[in-house]
């Protein structure tokens, strides 16, 4: 197998009484997937949660829909990977009170507590057994790749879940550690919620384990809009690809993803397809973010790119070219005056000596150190006036403050500063 390909659906929200718009979209979805996959081998299909709407019936229509996707993609039911979402559980007063108590006291999961929370997924589990002819596992090992399934909805079920989901750490760890010896395989984690919906301390543990047990990227849904994100907290870059909704409504972006990965280079792409409601057809697009403006986004597995890192470390720096760049930048700068600049000059190494950062950031910082003497030489030369020297830090601070609230991570901040 040279390439790994998959279809990613999410939040399909079957309710049993769909109107024209939803039926029209779903029928067209099947046709579009058939068109895309007609001359390609698809290895698996992902449905990242919310199969039904508000714990509605897992009826014949839902079963027929999933079976049709399986048949179109020419895969077996064993290659259909599904996780539950917050709509796939039964909300009740007992669950609400239990969750409120757990979140308030941050208690350790006891056996009885976990069993009570599991009961609310009974209808979902029964349906999965019917559709796959087996009980659902958390880990599926296939030649060349592995699928790790997470029930991120385990502690969902209130109107205020975001940032409050709690990880059942023992169950999570017992399963993910089975990937410890899978360094040579591609390892994909699948859940319903973005990781940021967990408690902050749980987020850190999830990324640490993703890093230590060879997870390469994470597929999810829930937000009803296509998107992506990158995490470096665990020590290396792990992407998240967030599929949009599979149900037409007033605010959702209806999307599905097609993923492709070269198993030799460990590089590939994810293409997003968006449903146009008025035109009633599919087009490429629907993934938010500058890197996906063309409708597709590059997929690179950081864990396998050691040779690329070595090339960056050995890259020669053209000092004359870098000087010219800085001087051209300075000519275009709009000077910003500050009557009371509150800047306390410090040596750059002193500034960074006490900072805590992961290995990837530290490594990237060290590759940039070679530029510092050049920048100092320019800043201390007679080519810049005192006003110009003082303006540059103020401009950087000003532009940073402008975009700080509009970006979700450091990379986006830099991109927005450069654009401005």
Residue ranges and their predicted role:
Residues 199-270:
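Conserved beta-sheet core of the metallophosphoesterase superfamily
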Residues 1-61, 69-71, 75-78, 174-177, ...:
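N-terminal active-site segment of His-dependent metallophosphoesterases
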Residues 13-18, 52-56, 84-97, 157-158, ...:
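Active-site environment of divalent metal-dependent phosphoester hydrolases
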Residues 63-166:
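Extended active-site neighborhood of metal-dependent phosphoesterases/phosphodiesterases
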Residues 12, 154-217:
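Active-site-proximal segments of metal-dependent phosphoesterases and phosphodiesterases across multiple
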Residues 261-409:
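A short C-terminal boundary segment appended to hydrolase-like catalytic domains
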Residues 1-7, 137-149, 232-238:
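Beta-strand-turn-beta hairpins that frame and shape the catalytic cleft
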Residues 8-10, 43-50, 78-86, 188-192, ...:
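Active-site neighborhood of phospho(di)ester-bond hydrolases with catalytic His/Asp-centered motifs
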């Amino acid at each position: 197998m040279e390439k790994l390909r998959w279809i990613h659906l999410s939040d399909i929200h079957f309710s049993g009484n769909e109107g024209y718009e939803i039926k029209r979209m779903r029928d067209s979805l099947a046709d579009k997937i058939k068109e895309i996959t007609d001359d390609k081998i698809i290895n698996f299909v992902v449905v990242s949660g919310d199969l039904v709407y508000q714990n509605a019936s897992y009826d014949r229509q839902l079963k027929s829909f999933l079976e049709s996707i399986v048949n179109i993609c020419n895969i077996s039911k064993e290659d259909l990977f599904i996780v539950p979402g917050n709509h796939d559980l039964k909300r009740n007063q007992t669950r609400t009170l239990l969750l409120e108590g757990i979140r308030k006291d941050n208690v350790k999961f006891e056996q009885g507590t976990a069993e009570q929370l599991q009961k609310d997924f009974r209808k979902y589990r029964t349906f999965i057994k019917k559709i796959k002819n087996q009980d659902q596992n958390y880990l599926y090992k296939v030649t060349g790749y592995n699928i790790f399934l997470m029930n991120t909805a385990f502690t969902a079920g209130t109107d205020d879940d975001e940032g409050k989901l709690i990880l059942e750490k023992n169950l999570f760890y017992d399963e993910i550690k089975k990937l410890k010896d899978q360094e040579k395989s591609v390892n994909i984690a699948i859940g319903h919620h973005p990781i940021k919906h967990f408690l902050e301390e749980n987020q850190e543990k999830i990324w640490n384990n993703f890093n230590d047990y060879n997870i390469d990227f994470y597929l999810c849904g829930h937000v009803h809009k296509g998107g992506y994100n990158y995490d470096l907290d665990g020590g290396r870059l792990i992407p998240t690809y967030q599929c949009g909704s599979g149900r037409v409504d007033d605010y959702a972006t209806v999307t599905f993803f097609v993923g492709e990965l070269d198993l030799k280079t460990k590089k590939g792409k994810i293409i997003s397809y968006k449903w146009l409601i008025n035109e009633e057809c599919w087009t490429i697009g629907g993934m938010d973010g500058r890197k996906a403006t063309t409708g597709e986004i590059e997929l690179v597995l950081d864990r396998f790119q050691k040779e690329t890192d070595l090339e960056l470390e050995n890259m020669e720096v053209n000092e004359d070219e870098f000087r010219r760049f800085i001087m051209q930048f300075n000519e275009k700068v709009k000077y910003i005056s500050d009557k009371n600049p509150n800047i306390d000059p410090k040596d750059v190494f002193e500034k960074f000596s006490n900072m805590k950062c992961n290995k990837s950031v530290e490594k990237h910082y060290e590759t940039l150190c070679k530029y510092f003497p050049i920048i100092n030489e320019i800043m201390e030369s007679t080519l810049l006036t005192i006003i110009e020297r003082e303006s540059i830090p103020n401009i950087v601070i000003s532009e940073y403050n402008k975009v700080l609230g509009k970006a979700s991570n450091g990379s986006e901040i830099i991109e927005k500063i450069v654009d401005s």
